[in-house]
Structures are given as structure tokens and as C-alpha cells.
């Protein structure tokens, strides 16, 4: 019996919507990354993007444990001299709540073209509204 290898043109991708209200950031991000890679499917193949599309709503209501709300720092650089910036988790939630989940999930995906293709299937929204109703996403309870 030969080993099954998925082909990009035969992969069936579903759309799922996940509510992040009250979910722990890391535990949510690991499950999202797993589903974006397609590791939950029997036909998973490491070098083929077999993952599903994931819509995350209520990103502003994601939770962290302990003192991470004030202690967890996000760093970035503006590209200008002396342009290193940082913000706490609380500041990031106030400024751009989608980025918190996006950064967490992106770090858990493979680096390179395949990982970027997987990351593009993640859609994160701060509130409870999203504009993907035409795709008829199924509710995914994580």
C-alpha cells in the first residue's frame, strides 16, 4: 500500500468561525495554528497546505493568565533610526486587538512561503461582526 500524499488541487477547505471571548490566548492560538496547517485532517501532508480557513471574532475579549496583561511586551521597529517601540498586552488590546492573536498564531506557523500561505487563511476581527457570511462558516468551539 502506497503512502497517501495530498495534492494542492484536491484539498477541500472549510470555513470556521471561532469566538475568542474568554479564551486563553496561547491555548486558542495553538489550536488555530493546528487547524490552519491541516494537522487535524487524515490527509495531512507536511509540504502541502491542507488547512482550513479560520475567522476569529471578539479578539478584543481574549484573555491571558497571571500578570501577563501588564507584563507581556510586544516589540517592533518603525524602520527609522531609534525607532524601536514596545507596548504591553493591555495597550495592544486597546490599540489593535486583532494583532495580538495574529502575532501569536503567526509565530506558531512554519516560516517560509508555505507558512505565509497558511497565515493568509486566518481572518481576525475585534468585534462580533465579520464580512464572510457568503462562505457560510461553521461554528467551531475550541
Swiss-Prot record:
Pfam family, one: Ribosomal_L13
Coiled coil location: none
InterPro entries membership: Ribosomal_uL13, Ribosomal_uL13_bac-type, Ribosomal_uL13_CS, Ribosomal_uL13_sf
Any one GO CC term of the record: cytosolic large ribosomal subunit
Keyword Ribonucleoprotein: yes
Key words of the record: Ribonucleoprotein, Ribosomal protein
Gene Ontology terms describing biological process: negative regulation of translation; translation
CDD domains listed in its UniProt record: Ribosomal_L13 (cd00392)
NCBIfam families for the chain: rplM_bact
Subunit structure: Part of the 50S ribosomal subunit.
Homology family: Belongs to the universal ribosomal protein uL13 family.
Function in brief: This protein is one of the early assembly proteins of the 50S ribosomal subunit, although it is not seen to bind rRNA by itself. It is important during the early stages of 50S assembly.
Protein name stated in the entry: Large ribosomal subunit protein uL13
Species the sequence originates in: Pasteurella multocida (strain Pm70)
Annotated gene: rplM
